[in-house]
């Protein structure tokens, strides 16, 4: 990426820019001796009732909230319409309203916000579907840059883009970013494999290497000013992998195990990131957090064998820290499948899981998936409360967990 300075046309003009190519930039992961405790639940917070949601999140002593920042593909997306000036967050095609709102609520609540850049707008991939990557990864890099400018902590939104009922002036900073979600799962990134000659290429890792590079470059290209340099404490996490994969390209629903995915992404040019992220869910409700997968499931990465993944991250990229950006146990009731555990066991497993994570010096964050159960039984019932708001024992355990 060439050096350039972009001036954003807006009332209360603020300076943002593109630094030297991230291929030569030096960003090192923060080393942390503590564990940030947080929540991943966008339905509850992003497009739910934010006033009530953040009152609850504060009462739970939440330190970090993760939500998706949709580039395209949903009604909540920022860029369903193609911008004329994609690196400018003030471009009128962009719709940041939901994200401005949640950024202000999080800031006012003393909660750090994490944005996961996700899904491709149809104009960027020829209408191939939101889980398919863009034809040009420059488009993704430009969007990541625009988002990082807007939430740099130094940006005043143009009057036409600002909801003045939530306040005016500089938008709050967001310094935690993740690139996509579970790219080793075809629900989130497709295709997982393509045939190249007589072999199968892990296409999800090939494309993800470029997704990671684009988001990393875009976020880290933002300057407060040429003199003051980059936004302080900005971190981009890559990986964000799900715990399992069948490694079966000929099946109707192929996926990639997280170790194979990391190795392939490195091979295909995933250059750098500040933190790695992973979702080390158990395979069943009767597996405690310390359970180590064996046999045919040995390449599944859960909390009990998380050091296997950390060792691979170290081998390829050095001793980067790990963010656990999703974790949880579903409860029975209401989930009567193999994934459900009792309300009492969920609370016990939560305490055990956070103790395991806290004892690992390279795990610096752990986010529980859901405040409330999802209403559809085919969804997730790992909430601290039921869909009607009845608190499970895990509610009080989460409140009392040690915070970093």
Regions found by a protein language model. Give the residues of each.
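Bacterial N-terminal signal peptides
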Residues: 9-18
């Amino acid at each position: 990426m060439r050096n350039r300075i972009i001036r954003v046309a807006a009332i209360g003009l603020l300076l943002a820019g593109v630094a030297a190519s991230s291929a030569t930039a030096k960003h090192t992961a923060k080393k942390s001796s503590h564990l940030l405790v947080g929540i991943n639940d966008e339905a509850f917070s992003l497009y739910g009732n934010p006033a009530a949601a953040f009152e609850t999140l504060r009462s739970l002593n939440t330190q970090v909230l993760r939500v998706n920042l949709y580039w395209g593909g949903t009604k909540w997306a920022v860029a369903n319409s193609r911008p004329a000036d994609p690196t400018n967050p003030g471009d009128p095609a962009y719709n940041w309203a939901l994200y401005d709102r949640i950024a202000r609520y999080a800031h006012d609540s003393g909660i750090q916000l994490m944005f996961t850049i996700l899904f491709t707008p149809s104009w960027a991939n020829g209408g191939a579907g939101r889980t398919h990557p863009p034809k040009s990864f420059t488009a993704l890099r430009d969007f990541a840059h625009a988002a990082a400018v807007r939430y740099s902590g130094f940006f005043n939104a143009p009057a036409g883009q600002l909801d003045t009922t939530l306040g005016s002036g500089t938008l709050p900073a967001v310094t935690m970013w993740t690139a996509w979600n579970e790219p080793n799962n075809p629900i989130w990134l497709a295709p997982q494999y393509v045939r190249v000659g007589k072999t199968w290429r892990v296409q999800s890792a090939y494309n993800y290497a470029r997704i990671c590079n684009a988001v990393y470059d875009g976020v880290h290209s933002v300057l407060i000013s040429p003199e003051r340099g980059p936004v302080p404490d900005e971190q981009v996490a890559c990986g964000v992998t799900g715990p399992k994969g069948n490694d079966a390209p000929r099946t109707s629903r192929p996926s990639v195990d997280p170790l194979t995915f990391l190795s392939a992404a490195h091979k295909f040019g995933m250059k750098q990131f500040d933190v790695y992220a992973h979702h080390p869910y158990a395979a069943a409700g009767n597996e405690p957090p310390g359970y180590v997968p064996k046999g045919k499931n040995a390449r599944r990465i859960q909390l009990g064998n998380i050091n296997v993944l950390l060792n691979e991250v170290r081998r390829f990229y050095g001793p980067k820290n790990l963010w656990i950006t999703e974790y949880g146990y579903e409860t029975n009731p209401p989930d009567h499948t193999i994934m459900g555990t009792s309300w009492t066991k969920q609370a016990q497993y939560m305490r055990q899981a956070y103790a395991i994570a806290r004892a690992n010096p390279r795990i610096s964050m752990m986010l529980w998936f859901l405040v409330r159960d999802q209403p559809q039984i085919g969804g997730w019932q790992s909430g601290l409360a039921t869909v009607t708001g009845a608190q499970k024992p895990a509610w009080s355990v989460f409140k009392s967990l040690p915070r970093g």
